[in-house]
Amino acid sequence: MNAQPGTPPRESVRLVSRRDVRLVNRAGHVYICSSTGTLRVPQRNPELSELEGDIGLEFLPDDVIAGLRSRTLVHSASDAPLSHPLYDTGGPGATRPAVVVGEGPLADGVAERLRRAGAEAVRAPAPDRSADPGALVLPLHGEETLLRRWTERAMEARAPILTHLSSPTRLLFAVLDPPRTACPVCLVRRLRANHTWQPIADLPLDVLYGAAESDRWPTTAIAAAMLAHQTMAALTRGTSGPAELLEVDHATLVTTRHPALHTPLCPACAPVAAPPEPAEPPAVDPESCWGRMRRAVDPLTGLVAEVRVRDADREPGNSTTHVLTAGHPTTTWFSPVQASSCSGAVKYDPTLARVCAVGEFMERYAAGVYDPDRLVRASFRKLGAAAVDPRSLPLASEREYAALSRIAPFDPDLELDWVEGRSLTTGQVRYVPACAVYVPYRFPRRRERLIDPISTGLAAGSGPHHATLGGLLEVVERDAVAVFWENRLALPTLDLGGLTGGPAAAIVERLTAAGVQVLCKDLTTDLGIPAVSVRYVEGPADRPMVAHATSAHLDLHGALLGALEEADLCRTGLRSWLAERDIPGVDDIELDRSDFYTYYCGPGRLSLVPFWDEGPLRPLPAPSPAPASYQAAVEEVVRRLAARGHEPIAVDITPVDVAECGVRVVRSVVPGLCPITLRRDFRRRGGRRLYEAPVRMGLRAAPLTEDELNPYPLPLG
């Protein structure tokens, strides 16, 4: 039977239950049932001891009423119109109107449902400063200039933006809170940059995505209800956490979540958006890194459409995992150049392989995203001592200048673009030529083309020290292989028989069992930072597959493992390239990137570089202790470089969207060290170290002349 009020213990004071709440007295307890769960409290009212069934609030003691009010299960009768388990009547925007932009059945439906829920809904065709919006409902397919003005108005009012695009088959919407999150302009530019068919990506967004609505369509009514609901939640509860673009499939009602990342150089929110700077972890944890970085992988709004894992025949504990990224944004939607998009990794740890593949993409993406207006425009002479002398990068030799009209000799009075970096030895600001930071880089004038931009020194990491370390070690690696290759040095061969257990031993054992010849050279130079180069040779003598790779590390064992893994990645690429294209001729000058990998796969090509097989056999040293942190590792590398007179410089080029994925990208530059190039006719032989390092290392009695340097191309890997 239902309990009757009888004589209530106290008079109800204009309180009512939320509409989804039921109070049931049963078995000595009062059960509070609602859509958010069920609570149970002991029965303390004597009048309820012999009654069971539904009861009213008047039978509950004050402390229970207070608890229910704190959970929004009970509220003042005056709040009844807004009462809902997902809405908070005391939220930041509850007293301000929702501004609904646009005309048509969808906007009409959203405004009407908001009013029925008790909220104030205002229609506005254009940004109006007289209104103080608590939330903004904004179609995503408006003109960018209008989206920008609305975004600026919302940021002034500190109001969340519910932006949307509705079609008969799906609804796209996001609750944004710029500048904390991306803004609608960010989202539009990202959607365009990721669109499959770039020739039409500039069409109005409603055309690209088939936006349409009708008051006869249930899908329009569904979209209006969902948008009104999300607006009510934003009005009454505010926003928090990372933003997402939700995609609701009307056929299946399946919801897919896409990351809503800031777009670099957004004209609406970039001036006030602050990239996140989380604390740098002391060591790389692949799982936690991947947990942050996987936000970058999404076909609609990500930096990378997908990650492809090639490990179908992987043997757990005895093999490597090969990962490639696929589907990359057209960065010319927000940068003057198209960033390089190829990236991949081979690692013993499958999660680390994913992290490194996406990290490599982020390096190249970051290096292709810049604003020319933010560069420092000045001559070397005008900047003075704060500027890095471009001749120390180094530049071309006199002979190379004479042979190449596209490369211009350096003029100290010529205005160039510069990027602000920081010296790792003094902490002072140093200006680095933009062409040595960004790749690709658009030279404003032909006479400013001092070099062909390359990626050496680019690195992504979980923090600034991690990224700086990776970049510095890559610079050291490239310097070591350039000195070795150009001077055709007979350097020690590492005795791999000393490997006992661990990933490096497993890789060598697997490859050797497959008939691959594995040769490892110790390329460590006078800098004292270990560098190892690896060569794999397999297949018939008339068509061998030859893979090369080099790596540097503070521990020679770390350099060895890095080179072995990188060469494994190179093997995978070689299989595709050798199947698709011819091997370049011995004397071919014009080579593309893949030619530098395949050049030594031609018959008899290894005989051109006999020094690879020369040099003493050297046992592996004992492993070196790891530094306590990335910062300590950077300091040790800097110490060794400074001891040889080199000043390393770091330039943080992290775009905001990369930072939102927990990654930093740094370009490390070490003036004076030797670079590599992707040109056979331009090797930047103008620096002295290329000639003098072998003498300092005791490997040459006198420097070689330029005529005596190796004429054959350096293999990539």
Predicted regions and their residues:
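Hydrophobic structural packing positions in well-ordered secondary structure
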Residues: 154, 183, 228-231, 559
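Long terminal accessory regions outside catalytic cores
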Residues: 1-33, 277, 306-310, 336, ...
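Internal hydrophobic alpha-helix adjacent to the cofactor/substrate pocket in enzyme cavities
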Residues: 221-240
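Helix-biased "structured C-terminal domain" signature
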Residues: 60, 67-70, 241-717
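E1/E1-like adenylate-forming module used to activate ubiquitin-like modifiers
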Residues: 133-223, 267-270
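Short, charged low-complexity linear segments at domain edges
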Residues: 153-169, 235-253
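Long, charge-rich, low-complexity alpha-helical segments
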Residues: 2-4, 26-29, 34-120, 175-177, ...
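Short acidic low-complexity segments
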Residues: 121-133
